[in-house]
Each structure stands twice: as C-alpha cells, then as structure tokens.
Amino acid sequence: VKLLTFSILAAPHSTLLLKTLIMQYRNFGKLNWKVSEIGYGMWGMAGWSGGEDKETEMALDRSVELGCNFFDTAYAYGAGKSENILANLLKRQSGKRLYTATKIPPKNHEWPSIKGSSIQDVFPAQHIIDYTERSLKNLGVETIDLQQFHVWEDAWSNEDEWKLAIEKLKKEGKIQGMGISVNRWEPNNCINTLHTGLIESIQVIYNIFDQNPEDELFPYCEKNNIAIIARVPFDEGSLTGTLNAQSTWDKGDFRNLYFCEENLIPTLERVRNLSNELPNNMTLPELSLRFIKHHPAVSTMIPGMRKIRNVENNMQIGSDKNEVFTEEILAFTRKHRWDRLPTKWSH
C-alpha cells in the first residue's frame, strides 16, 4: 500500500478538503498481482453516450493519481476506441505499473453467447489469436496482462480450440493471463471450464441486486485462487439513484435496451425501497461499492467513471478498510437480493 494525498469535495460549493488516504490493494489470484480494490471499467469511454475525450483523459489520470492500477476494456468497446484511450493513458503514465485487461469479441457477434453454439463459430483459434494481435496494437503494448473471452458457454470447456490458442499466446508472451467474462445472470456458466486450470480470472456481475455469484462461483474461486473482477456494481446506473421513469439515452446506447419498461419500472421500485432505508448516512453509490468490497473473493471491482468527481468518490471507498460496513448493514443488503434469469433485454 502507499499513502495518497488528494482533495475531495466535502459538500456542494464548499472548499476542497485535503485527506490522506491509503489505497487498498488485493491479490489477483494465481497471477499474484496487487490490484487496487477499485479498478476502472472502460465500456463507457466508447460504448455509451455522454463521454468527452478530454474529460475522459482527466478522469483516467485522476484515478491513477489516487492509486487505481487496474483498467478493463475490450475490443468491442468502440471497435478498439476504448483500447486506444487506454493506450494513451499508458503513455501518459509510463512510470506507473498499470494492469491492462481486454476482451476478445465473439466471432458471430452474439452477446450473450447462444446455447448450443459451437466454439468454431464463436472463438476459433485463429480468431482468438487475430484479435489478441489487434488489441496488442491498439494498446501499444508487447504483452496484454489479462486477455478475456467476452462471452462464454461452459459446454466449450473440453474443446481444444481455445486451449491451444491461449497456450500459444502465453508461450509467446503475448498475454500473461486468461479470463472469462461470464454472461449476465449466469455466474456458474464457467465452472467446468475452471477445472481445466487454464483460466486465471472470472469477470462477473455482482452488486446489491445480483448477489448469486456468492452461492457457488465465489467459493470455488476462493478455494482455487482464481481472481474475481466484479462488474456492473451500479446495475448499469440504477444503483446510483439517478434514474427515473423518464430517463432516456442516445440512440445506440445499451441502456435503452436494458432499461426497457419491463425492467425499468420494477428496478425503480426496488431502488426506492433500498434508498428509503440507507444506513449510517451512506449514499446509495457508497453502499453499493461497500457491499462488493465486503466479500474477500473479489479481487477488484470496475465501476465506469467519466467524471472526476465520480473518480474521487469511488476511489475513496477503495482507500479504507470498510469498517463502517457492519454485519447489520450486510444483513440489510441481503434483503435486497434480486435473482433474475437472462431474457431478451439482458445482454
């Protein structure tokens, strides 16, 4: 750990107060990296509306200043644009050890993966190699710290196609580790694949609503020293408390699909119920991150952040030992678990 001094906004229109914080780091599975408890999810840098490049650069630089060292992107985020943004960060922060994680898109362009699809249709060996080479170029690095499959079906666990490809990439030094980003609300759709010993990390949706990774996936990963990257900590934005029934997004923004009326209305009701009982003067975003932080299986979480104020607020959560998250508060969050099954809008 290291001491970090930075300023946060105590209240609207107040002066900046200086606080000395210690960014907390956790072990990243068998790779033995020390990664910041709060990482950086970069989907919103290229795949969502509302991001401006200069503001993006400032937010990324601020995160590094505050101790963030894990950055998750994907080729599919703007067809390499998000990877290019990360490449520029690596150049600007060349003196820092920053960990790069990206993802290989499915060849058939299906998110999530389709049950019964073949590995040859989704991740043939040459496709894995070709897109790793593209990402290496986009990122401007010789080695990708963590390459990941952007979708997955556990039925592919015994296929040699993907195994031979990642063994080749590791042997050639093109990647250090390999991970899987599991489909939404299918946290166990990877367990048999983990038995192969070839996967170093799992990226999974885990938040106050989506707690089911704790049932089977987390215990397995803890026992076998597999890193967990918790994604979608704010349920695509609902757990920030900023959405309402009239919320809209630009054409092409994923949230138009995810927050269709079928999902938005019950989500807002659950957010209201949660917000009405917030403990210890916590904000909803703070509670959301502290809930994820409480679980020892989680190596890092990757909220999306495009504003400096959000970077500062989120990094602050990664800089304490979470003593304020008591057993009583944990029991409170348990009441808000929401088990859901994949559907047409839950890509």
Question: What are these regions, as identified by a protein language model?
Answer:
Residues 28, 40, 71, 86, ...:
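Conserved, mostly hydrophobic/aromatic
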Residues 34-38, 67-69, 94-98, 141-145, ...:
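Short, well-ordered coil/turn segments that N-cap beta-strands
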Residues 51-63, 123-138, 185-192:
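Short, acidic/polar
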Residues 152-344:
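Beta/alpha (TIM)-barrel catalytic core signal, keyed to glycine-rich beta->alpha loops juxtaposed to Asp/Glu
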Residues 136-155:
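Active-site groove signature of glycoside hydrolases
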Residues 30-48, 101-119, 148:
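N-terminal small/glycine-rich loop or linker at the start of catalytic domains
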Residues 6-8, 12-22:
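Short, Lys/Arg-enriched N-terminal segments with co-localized hydrophobic residues
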Residues 19-98:
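N-terminal binding-site loop/beta-alpha segment at the start of enzyme catalytic domains
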